[in-house]
Amino acid sequence: MRFRFVLFLFLFSITIFAQELVSTKSPDSISHWTKKNKLGFDISEITFVNWSAGGNSAVSGLLKGDFSRVYAKDNQKWVNDLSIRYGLNKQDGHEMRKTDDAIQINSTFGYRKDTITNWYHSAKFNFNTQFTNGYSYPNTQKAISRLFAPAYIFLGVGAENASKKKHRIFYISPFTFKTTLVLDQRLANQGAFGVTKAQYDSNGNSIVDGKKSKTELGFLFTSYYKKEIVKNINLVNKVVLYSDYINNFGNIDIDYDFLLDLVVNQYVRASIGARIIYDDD
């Protein structure tokens, strides 16, 4: 069982580069594609000089990108999203440490019976992994995670309700396959992230290597809510709940994301957020 809680706060964050195309359509009137591209780099710095109360000077950087391609025609909708995040922090007296690392790909195809209803018959694909090695600081001798170790793949069918007026989307799937990949043999041998660990003889020699994948069939619920609650203050709330039918049904894996984005101007912003991940395995 693992439980992770990440709380991050950027009091003064400067966006050095950002590009956003909220709704761009091809000049060709028959195109049904829209796209959104957003890339930014936030940096924050704290400096102490002869500060008697104590504290360490620190500098942090966060690269983030959000890209989407949406096809919509009549009763059909196909939404494709790519989200990347990579953050580093350097404090006096400490080595460079990673603060955020994520690659997320989502693709949802939906079909509704008419153009009035908000309900879609949907098929959904999700893929999540990371860029670089993760460590249990200050120990950086052995990685506790790597690219594709783990990686999570969700593939299933269900129903989605998308309401622009209510600024939310939720998806329910009674049949979703979840595959966990651990493409690092050392971590797989340890049984990391729920895969079957290696078997050893009485002398400690490996008899059977740990498995590098694990597949489950279960129930999936996802919810996404985004709204400008007041001018220049945006709220983003995401939750993913999954329970395996075969192993310990009722024990729920949770991935919860909360972000409050406060925009001062084009260059200065503050973000307050939290992420909670609970995996029963």
Residue ranges and their predicted role:
Residues 37-39, 80-82, 121-125, 157, ...:
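Membrane-embedded beta-strand positions of outer-membrane beta-barrel proteins
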Residues 75-78, 115-120, 167-169, 232-235, ...:
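Repeated loop/turn-to-beta-strand initiation elements of outer-membrane beta-barrel proteins
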Residues 49-55, 90-96, 140-146, 206-211, ...:
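Extracellular loop and loop/strand-boundary signature of outer-membrane beta-barrel proteins
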Residues 41-47, 73-75, 84-90, 125-133, ...:
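Transmembrane beta-strands of outer-membrane beta-barrel pores
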Residues 41-43, 63-71, 105-111, 127, ...:
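Residues on the lipid-exposed face of transmembrane beta-strands in outer-membrane beta-barrel proteins
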Residues 57-63, 99-105, 149-155, 213-219, ...:
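Residues that define the transmembrane beta-barrel architecture of outer-membrane proteins
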Residues 247-281:
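Predominantly the C-terminal beta-signal and adjacent terminal strand-loop region
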Residues 29-45, 76-78:
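Transmembrane beta-strand segments of Gram-negative outer membrane beta-barrel proteins
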